Structure formats: structure tokens, C-alpha cells
């Protein structure tokens, strides 16, 4: 906040000495500091040699003189220093026009601008640079800016102010006259009535009664006009009633003026009230519009949030669909893999099939060996023939043999399944199996060739004579000849 104090240009400055001016402010010289003698000397030559700062290019040329007459005063205590103190302090240098305090009041230090009436007082003021003002040394320098002054009064503005003042004076007079009016008005009316009746009686006595009856209205008007003239003459002669009547007229005029003014005031107040009501209505409409805008903004925000939620749900649904598609693809790939595996299994015979073939081949070999053993021992057949009555029928024997073969085949199948479900064996064991199978194949071929020779003898033995008890024991126990290696023993070893 800045404050402007007018100097010599606006208010009269007392012509007291600088010491008395400072003492009137209540500021001691010891607190302000010693004033250098060079500053008080009017014939200073050295101070005029201080160079002035260059001005900016955009400075108004009409303010150059003001800038040259202005001084910057800094390092002022914002709590104790006032514009009046600065004004009184710099009056000892020269005539001061304006003093403006500047800077923030809340800060500990402030600064000010002092404009002198004469440019010659500027170098004197510069001599105070470093002088103690209160508890701080002053910093004085040339100013780069002019003091911003209030606008000067134009003749039109002055005339408006005079009119307003005169209106106020007239209103005051009207109020005073209205207060005095009821007493003076009654007395004036009584005196006026008496004077009028006296003049009328004189005029009536001079004129005749019969002539009044015959006269026309026009003549009566002319007489009344003459009467008014005579009345004016009488009023001029008598000074006191004339003055009273003029006062009453002025009062009446003042009343009419006051009434007209009151009417004007009422109309103005009504107009102002209407304008205020319109402004209030506009403000209400604006507030409503603002509330509507806020509601629209809120609705827009809600719509955006809903759209975001919908988008999130759509993204989730898309992700779910993608997951489902992936699962379907995985299922399809699994199905295709299973189909391929099944096709491969259908192309390659299963191990159980090979095991069944092996079991069948082993049963065939056993049959062949039995037929060979029966052909080699013909003596036993004779004993069998003798004891045919005790042995059972050949049909029952064939059934028992079939059951035994089935049981053996079933056992061999179980063993092979157990082998297949167990851990896979090394490649060396598989090679060993293949070698064993290769070694057994020529034996099988030899036995097959012998089988064709022994079929005839076997058929004859089955028809002619039953088997011996030794053969029954061999079949029941499943033993093989000691000379040849049985496939069942090989399978057990494997």
C-alpha cells in the first residue's frame, strides 16, 4: 500500500525553520542523525556534479522534468517511519511537492519517493545519503520513475462538484423553511386579507351602483385588472407587507422544489431498485446456469465412468473368449494327438497280441513234444491198452487238457501284461530277447517238420489206445523232456 502526501504544491507549508519542524513531529535530532553542513549550504558546486542516471527510451517526455526533480529514499523502518516525517525532514533541503511511501508494510524495510519543486534541491538531498534517520542510515539516490499523482480536476468536474454542493445547500434551506412555515404562513394570510378588503371598499365607493349592474363581463375584467395594478402600487408603498409576501412566495417555491426533488428522488430510487432487481434476477439466472453446468458436468463424468466400466467388462469378456478359444485349441490338439496315437496303435500290433501268439506257439510245442514222447515209448502204450478199462474216456481227457491249456495261456498273458506295465528295460535286454527268439526259431522249424511225421501216429494212438499214466503225469505237471529246452523255462528266465 502506498500513501501520497501533498507538499507545497497542494497545501501551504509553514515557513518555520527545519529544527522547529522536526521538533514539532516529536522526532529528536539525535534519533534522526546529524545533518551535514554541506546540505544546508545553498551555494553548493560539488553536489551538482553528481551524474544523473540515463532514462529509458519509453519514458513520457512530459514526465522527464518530474523524474529529474524526484529522489529515491530507501532503508526506511516500516514500523516507525511515516510520510509526514519524511516531508518535514526534506523541507530543510528545499520545497517539497509530493511524498509517496512505497513497499510492503509487513516487511521490516520500506522506501519512498520525494519530489521537489526545484531541481536544484536534488543534489542537496543526495548529500543526506548515509545520514541516520531514526535507527537506520538513509539510502538516497536519483529516481528513475516519477510519482504517480491523482488526476487534476477539469473545469467540468469542478462545475459538477459546485452544482452538487449548491443542491445540498438548497435542500438544507428548504428543510429549515418547512420547519418555520406553519407559524409565519398564518400571520401573512391574515394581513393580506385585511389589505385586500380595504382597497376593495375604496374602489366601490368611487363607482356608482347602477353602472355596475349594466356593465358587461369584459368591463368587469378590465376593472379587475386595474384593481390589481392599484394593489401592486399599494404593496410597493407599504414595504413591510411586501417583504412578508415575498418570503411566503419563496417558501411556496421551496416547497414545490422540495416536492419535485422528492418525486425525482423517488423515481430515481425506483429506477435503482428496478435495476438492482434486474441484476439480482440475472445473478440468479447465472447461478442456475452454473448449477445446470455443474450437473451436466457430473452427468458427463458419470457417463464416462459407465463407459469405462462397459469397456472393462468388454475387455474381460474378450479375455474370457480368448481363454476359451485357447482351451478349445488345446482340446483339439489333444484329440488330434490321441487320434494319431490310436492310428499308430492300430498300425502296430499290441504286445498282448504277440504274447498270445507266443503262448499259442508254446502250447503247440508242448503238444508236439508229447506226441514225440508217445511215439518214442511204444511199450507204455501197450500197458495203457491193458488198463483201458480203468482209465477215463478220451473225450474227458481232451476237455481237461483244453482247460489246462487255457489256464496256462491265461497265466502267461498275465505275466506278459505285468512285464509291459513295468518299467522299460534296457536295449541290451531287448537284444538278448531277440537273440533267444532267433535261436528258438530254427528249433521250432525242426519241430514243425517232425510234427507232420508224428501226426499220423498221434491220431492212431488217440483212436486205438488210451494214454499211459506216465503221459498223464507229464501233461498234468507240464514237464518237458530233459534233452530239449522248454520255452516256458526261457520265459521265466526272461
From Swiss-Prot:
One Pfam family cited in the UniProt record for this chain: RRM_1
Annotated signal peptide: none
Record cross-link Glycyl lysine isopeptide (Lys-Gly) (interchain with G-Cter in SUMO2), residues: 490
Gene Ontology, cellular component aspect: spliceosomal complex
Top-rank taxon, per record: Eukaryota
Cell wall biogenesis/degradation found in the keyword field: no
Main location as per UniProt: nucleus
Polar residues bias spans: 476-486
BP GO annotations: mRNA processing; RNA splicing
Spans annotated as Disordered: 176-494
GO MF annotation: an example: RNA binding
PROSITE patterns the record matches: RRM
Keyword Phosphoprotein in annotation: yes
PANTHER family the UniProt entry points to: SERINE/ARGININE-RICH SPLICING FACTOR, SPLICING REGULATORY GLUTAMIC ACID AND LYSINE RICH PROTEIN 1
Function summary: Participates in the regulation of alternative splicing by modulating the activity of other splice facors. Inhibits the splicing activity of SFRS1, SFRS2 and SFRS6. Augments the splicing activity of SFRS3.
Name of the molecule in the record: Splicing regulatory glutamine/lysine-rich protein 1
Classification lineage: Eukaryota, Metazoa, Chordata, Craniata, Vertebrata
Gene this protein is translated from: Srek1
